Structure formats: C-alpha cells, structure tokens
Amino acid sequence: MFDPKKFVEEAIEELRREIGDRKAIIAVSGGVDSTTAAVLTHRAIGSHLVCVFVDHGFMRKGEPERIRELLEEELGLNLRFVEAAEEFFEALRGVTDPEEKRKIIGEKFIEVFERIAEEEEAEVLVQGTIAPDIIESERGIKSHHNVGGLPEKLNLDVVEPLRDLYKDEVREVARYLGIPDEIVERMPFPGPGLAVRVLGEVTPEKVEIVREANAIVEEEVEKAVEEGKMSKPWQAFAALLDCKATGVKGDERDYGWVIAVRIVESIDAMIADVPEVPWEVLRNIQDRITSEVPEVTRVLFDITPKPPATIEFE
C-alpha cells in the first residue's frame, strides 16, 4: 500500500543528494503534478528553488492570475512569472501535426527555462513528470512536453521526483504536503494547454474560442456534480475541431466552428471510460456554447473510451 509520508521523507533525502547546494528551477502550471513537485523540492532545498510560471497563452480562463495567487500567497513559493504567449504562437505558426506541435511547445518551454535558469544561475531543472507521461512517450503514443520535448543537449541536470507515481498517488502526496484542495482536485490539464485542444494550426483566435467553450463545459459539469446529477469526472473539457459546419442563427445561414465535448472517468489516466452524462447537462452545455461563443455553430459529444482514443485529442 502506498505510504505518502514514507515517499515524502525518501524523496526529500534524494532531492538533497541530487541537487546539493546548487540552485534549481521548476516549471509550475498550477496543476497537482508540478505543484507537488515544487512543494516537495522546496521542502528539500528551500530558497535554492525558483518556480517558473510561463504564461504561454494556452491556459484556461482566468487561470494565470489564480495560479499566481495560490502559489505565491498560499504556498509561499518563490515564483517568477513569464509572459511568453507571442513566442509560442509564433513558433506554432503554420504547424498542424499534433506530434510536431507537442515537440515545438516542449522545445520552446525548455528554451524559456534555460534563459531564466541562466539569469538565476540555476544548474538543475526539476520536473513534475509522472509515470503515465513516461509510459506514453516511451510507447510512442504521444510526446509529453516534459518528456519528449527535451533537447538532446540540455544544459541543465534534470530531476523528476514524481516519475514513479501515478496520478492518484500524486494526489495523496499533495494532501500530505498540505497543498490546497483547489489544486489537489483540479482536473488534469495538459502541459501544452489549450494548444492540444485546438486541432490543426493554433492561432490566438482559435485558442480564445476553445478557452470560452472549455470554461462553459467545466462550469456546467461542476454545477451538475454539486446538484448530485452526476459524479465528478476525471476530466471534462472542450476541443476545437479543425473544420467548420453550416448552421442557422436567427434567420440567417452561418458557417462556424465545431466544438467536441469530452468527459471521461479514470483513476490513473492509463485507461479511461465515458460516463453516461445526463442529457440535460449536455443540452445546457450545447445551449451555452452556441449562444455565448458566436463563432461556434455545432457541438458534438465524444463517447470514445481510452483505448482506442487518448484522453486529449492531440
């Protein structure tokens, strides 16, 4: 049986051995993986850790501001906030292949971190990589920005304190470390963010559409859970398909984007199933998206489990 107390004690000792008196940086997204890795490392080396939050332009609605508040004020981490949206959008210009997008985002992340690391005179990069990330990357299912995107000649030593843990174990460790429930229970969110929920080329306009649609999905699912209409899913989100469809708004023909809604249940992200979501919930999601996001004319519901599909679309 997994013992979070024992894991934390051993991980802190190992981090101290691996990092020593060197300065380290870690990418924090506000998710449970990176936050747990950050708090764990902070316990081990204190002020020698610099937490770097990169706003790549692909975060959920209102997320950068809230994450900054949680990490700085509530957890007391030493945080550097980097605005880099223009860099990421430019790097992804014209790119449509999902693997290429993930690789580019990973490389850009490392490029930004190396720049910050040089300014901070850091020698170690701590990552919140967990077991499913490594397994999917090794099997060639999909690259993860904190696994497959690493350049061969990385100028920093890489430390991954959570690499042997699955998501449910990470949450146990997070609770033991006193991390707020808002982070512990936060739905998993991919490192590349909304960029992998935009099929085809990633543009600021497309990201804004999926950001608004995604917020609606999360709000409606959270409301349904609170009202006892459904159990809390592993993930619930919106993806923007790389196609348009004809619609009718008012008395006029419209030609707009198609949103796919994805709701899944899982324990460790290795396999996932699709729950029977109440029809009322799906209708509410559709009504709000097509009325509040004018660029969208059609909303679909994805019923494919993992396998054969992956949880994210890209």
UniProtKB/Swiss-Prot annotation:
Heterodimer composed of a glutamine amidotransferase subunit (A) and a GMP-binding subunit (B). CDD domains: GMP_synthase_C. Keywords: ATP-binding, GMP biosynthesis, Ligase, Nucleotide-binding, Purine biosynthesis. Catalyzes the synthesis of GMP from XMP. Signal peptide: none annotated. It catalyses: XMP + L-glutamine + ATP + H2O = GMP + L-glutamate + AMP + diphosphate + 2 H(+). This is GMP synthase [glutamine-hydrolyzing] subunit B. The lineage of its organism: Archaea, Methanobacteriati, Methanobacteriota, Methanomada group, Methanopyri. Residues 2-186 form the GMPS ATP-PPase domain. ATP binds at residues 29-35. Pathway: Purine metabolism; GMP biosynthesis; GMP from XMP (L-Gln route): step 1/1. It is an enzyme of class 6 (ligase). Its EC number is 6.3.5.2. It comes from Methanopyrus kandleri (strain AV19 / DSM 6324 / JCM 9639 / NBRC 100938). GO terms for cellular component: cytosol. One of its GO terms (molecular function) is GMP synthase activity.
